[in-house]
Amino acid sequence: MNKAWIPLRLRDTILHRPDFFLGTEYAQMSINTTDASTPNTSISGPGINPDTGKIDPHAVTISGLALDASYTPDALPTSLVNFERDINNPGEFPYTRGLFPQGYRTRLWTMRQFAGFGSADDTNERFKYILAQTKTKTAANTGLSTAFDLPTLMGRDSDDVLSLGEVGKCGVAIDTIEDMHRLYADIPIDQVTVSQTINAPACVIWAMYLAMAKQRNIAWDQLGGTLQNDILKEFHAQNEFIYPPEASTKLVVDTIEFQSQHVPKWNSVSISGYHIREAGSSATQELAFTLRDGMEYVEACLIRGLDIEEFAPRLSFFFNAHNEFFEEIAKLRAARRIWARMMKDRYGAKNKRSWFMKTHVQTAGCSLTEQQPYNNIVRVAYQAMAGVLGGCQSLHTDSMDETLGLPTEQAVTIALRTQQILAHETGVTRTTDPLGGSYFMEALTDKVEAEALAFIEEIDNMGRGPWKPEYATTSTIDDGGCVQGIHKGYFRRKIAEASYRFSEECEAGDRVIVGVNEYVDPNEDRQVEILSISQEVETVQVQTLQEFKAKRDTATTAAALQAIRDAARNNENVMPSLIEGALANCTLGEMVQAMADIYGRYTGGPEW
């Protein structure tokens, strides 16, 4: 049986060490014990054919939520019975229907296209291309989103032996403050919002960015953008972590605290479900794990003594828009409702902007196929529409060739034009939450919410339990439900189970993937232009880095690195010392290692 539907890293780990993802009780599980065509009559429940034990794809969503054939006023969903409490009007608590009464009539979503490859100069050129494609009188609210290469994501310099062969391959290589200057050269960073997709070394990259702004004489209060900075989901799904969960969470709080005091227009963390979904989770798991990660950061900030009204309005979220059209819309509606209630009722926030969930949405990379890649344009268009109908504040549309390599300029342009057609030709911007009030949509939103809340309760109970005000002075980061869930392997196990189930459904033909398991073209020509990165990029980047190190004042650099160690050792906020480190020409890898000298590096898996 072909296991191609399990994400590659996840599949390889399951096959070679099933206990790591699925727990010791599953260690002897055979991944391929029966043929997919063999009925499994032990399975039953809503949406399952009792004769075959197989799902009815017309009755169950991708996430396994059973659907009725039709919805009528004879069985109104709970939310419609309690309209003001559960749904209300757009712009009114609990914001199920959106944050603002006029929706996209007064402000379109930000068209934020992800870009990054090769050197800082290469990516700067792509940034300028993207800005040029969006600079019109009707679409001025654009932003940049930066993809970093694997060495940068792991906090390693380009000349590190572990970086060899990866420099500039899946994103841009950033080692120094000079790289940061080249990356944003001739771009008015006080006018364009900048998103940085970086997590484990997020505090260091952000420090370099702030130091660059200082050298350009741009006040920090003029900077707008978003730092992804969501380290918890790295332990759940993406595996790009450096420090232990407790120290990693502390660094997130450092950035949140520094942002609230010095960079008021910046979103200090983008709490990300996208990667959780890409790893194979269901929509409800994505929603629950993302919200609970956000709650973990809120609780860590309260333990630090921060004022919730100071930091909560700048928290943001990042969700996936997958193929199950209505489920994705329901997910975003339920997300706003749950978050608003948690912030108001559980954490006591009074300012309505602290209740707001601002969301960025990206179409589902894991849904794109190598086979018949032009079909991906259609997939992305529908997914983008789901994100918009769900009320996102910004949107990234994937390029159709991203399963094959880095996107070409033509593919990037088509992806961007998809958003522009959606915004200006379809009419979806004219009415806020146009599906609101639908018997089906409200019932599905309720169902997604209920399943997500059940997951959140499980995670709460793995730690200190549901938040109480006294925990601000009696608890620590170590007691958080997410931190404890990481150590117990909860998140990886749940994601692996969902991923494996979806894989089986696809291979059995229960889930049709056009061009892959149905409507296959045996004579298909897959010759699609792809963007490749020359080995010369790495050679030049390493040479430039070594020249940078040779010309700096080593005594100043050494003193700055020691200051970073001292701040970490004394449990201080590391941001001021990191900014000074960037100004003293410390490299990314050096500053990351200075903190690793104190916090250590996390190499262990779940404690099973």
Residue ranges and their predicted role:
Residues 117, 126-133, 177-187, 208-212, ...:
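Generic, well-ordered alpha-helical scaffold segments in large soluble proteins
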Residues 307-311, 349-363, 371-400, 407-432, ...:
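Flexible glycine/proline-rich, aromatic-decorated loop/lid segments
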Residues 2, 12, 16-19:
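Intrinsic-disorder-associated, low-complexity terminal segments enriched in Asp/Asn/His/Tyr and depleted
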Residues 175, 200, 239-259, 336, ...:
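Phosphate/diphosphate-binding loops
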Residues 40-41, 46-53, 59-76, 148-150, ...:
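Flexible, glycine-rich loop/tail regions that form catalytic "lids" or insertion modules at the edges
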Residues 165-168, 233-243, 276-281, 319-324, ...:
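Short beta-alpha connecting loops at secondary-structure transitions
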Residues 25-322, 327, 346, 353-360, ...:
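Catalytic alpha/beta active-site cores
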